[in-house]
Structures are given as structure tokens and as C-alpha cells.
Regions:
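N-terminal organellar transit peptides
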Residues: 1-117, 121, 137-139, 150-260
Length: 260
């Protein structure tokens, strides 16, 4: 191969690297600009969409540690005496991270209310976050999904309820139980208890009445449905959740979610 060809290839590679670097920084600049704009408008977004040029708080694909940390950073900069707007468009993620965000919302002591906006969907951990807010604004076609925690291995995902039920069934029928399943069932029991206590916390702080809180736990957290079960805005209202149904999102929210 001639020196000229090698030089040409190296030049192309360097050009691509520079182009990628510039693109990455352009996205970062745009995100920073959006974040500053949203802070001024008392908005936090948790948006996980491959179609969106506006990445979530830090570019996570699901709710994770980075989302949690960036949420807290954004929350600390907001005006607590005005209503805080949280835009949710996510399939969920890590329970611990979603729970940490929920605790931040539950511990809010400012005069302003915390309002969740769901233009399309908010599943699992995203639904948990919505339920922690003072009210939820949804379009008539927007949906929520169950919040029951999931266990997974390399090939399959299980609800914690199914892990517990499977182990109990095997015990009752004197069937051999793999050590892995025993360990998972113990972890699942602790996780289920943790989610029950989370709902009780929302009840005790006056977020829900005991009756409504029990219904919410049964429908969203108990694992009685498949994890892909959907709850419409009307279903949510029927459960006693403070949901406002709108034909379209407020202009302030639409400006941010237009590219989802």
C-alpha cells in the first residue's frame, strides 16, 4: 500500500473523529441550553426516547443513578415557592433510583405544588415518580404502567410476585428449589415489603387516603398484572388518583416534548 493511500485513510479517520467530537459537543451544548431554559421555567424532564434530540437529564436510556443525581441537582436550583413541573416519558429503570427521586418529591416542603406531565406514557419507575407528585396531567390517550419491581437474569425478566409465588408453589408440593431461586425469593420478599412501605409513606404524609393508597398498591405494585399492563388516564381517575385529562399539553410542555 502506497504512502499516499495510508495518509488518505488516516486523514479520513481523523476527520471522522473530529466530526464525532464536534457532534457530541453540539449535543452537550444544546442539552445545557435546554437545562438552563427549563430551570428558569421550573421544569425538570425525564425523557427517554431514541427519537428525541433533547436527551433526558443526563442521556440515560432508563432511570438510573445518573438520572437520580441530575434530578436532585436540577431540583435544588428550582424555585420551591412556585409550582414545579416534571415531564415524564420513560419506560422506567432501577427501583433504587426511581425511589430516590420519589423521596425527593415526597420531602418537598415548598409552597409550590409538584405536577407531573405525561404526554404519552410513563411506565414502572416513571409511574412511581408520577404517583409521588401532587397531581398528574395526562392527555386522554396517555398511559401509565405497573410499578412492581422486576428480577432478571441474562435471558428472562420476572416480576417479584411471580418469583415469590413460584417458590411457594414448589415448597407446597415438596419440589426441589434451586439455590438461585431461593435467594431471589428472599430478595423479592424484601423488595415487595419495601414497595408496600413506600405506598404507606405516601398515605401517612396525606398524599392518599388509606383506601385509595390500598387500591394503588394492589393495582400498580402488587404484581397482579403483567408488567406490560396499561392504565389509561380514565383508569387512573377511577382509582382515585389526582389526574387532570387535557386534549393537549400546555404550550410550555409542548415546546420541550415536540421532538419526542
Amino acid at each position: 500500500m502506497s504512502f499516499g493511500i495510508i495518509t488518505g485513510i488516516l486523514g479520513s479517520v481523523v476527520g471522522l473523529v473530529i466530526l464525532a467530537y464536534c457532534f457530541k459537543n453540539a449535543i452537550k451544548f444544546k442539552n445545557n441550553w435546554y437545562q438552563k431554559k427549563m430551570i428558569k421555567q421550573n421544569i425538570i424532564s425525564i425523557i427517554h426516547s431514541s427519537n428525541s434530540s433533547l436527551l433526558s437529564l443526563a442521556g440515560d436510556n432508563t432511570i438510573g443513578l445518573t438520572t437520580h443525581i441530575e434530578f436532585i441537582k436540577s431540583y435544588d436550583k428550582l424555585n420551591k415557592d412556585k409550582d414545579i413541573h416534571i415531564i415524564l416519558h420513560t419506560t422506567g429503570g432501577a427501583l433504587s433510583s426511581a425511589e430516590a427521586i420519589c423521596n425527593c418529591i415526597a420531602n418537598h416542603t415548598g409552597v409550590g405544588k409538584i405536577i407531573a406531565y405525561i404526554p404519552y406514557y410513563s411506565y414502572s419507575g416513571g409511574c412511581m415518580i408520577a404517583l409521588a407528585c401532587d397531581s398528574i396531567v395526562m392527555t386522554k390517550n396517555a398511559i401509565l404502567g405497573p410499578c412492581d419491581a422486576q428480577k432478571s437474569n441474562f435471558t428472562t425478566q420476572y416480576s417479584i410476585a411471580s418469583v415469590i409465588d413460584t417458590v411457594n408453589y414448589k415448597k407446597q408440593n415438596n419440589e426441589k428449589i434451586k439455590e438461585e431461586w431461593l435467594a431471589n425469593s428472599y430478595d423479592a420478599i424484601l423488595c415487595k415489603d419495601r414497595q408496600r412501605k413506600y405506598v404507606e409513606k405516601l398515605i401517612q404524609c396525606g398524599h392518599f387516603t388509606q383506601d385509595i393508597g390500598d387500591k394503588i398498591y394492589e393495582e400498580f405494585f402488587s404484581g397482579k398484572y403483567n408488567h406490560d399492563k396499561i392504565f389509561s388516564s380514565a383508569d387512573s381517575i377511577n382509582l382515585g388518583i389526582n389526574v387532570q385529562i387535557v386534549d393537549e399539553m400546555p404550550e410550555l410542555i409542548k415546546n420541550i416534548t415536540s421532538d419526542i
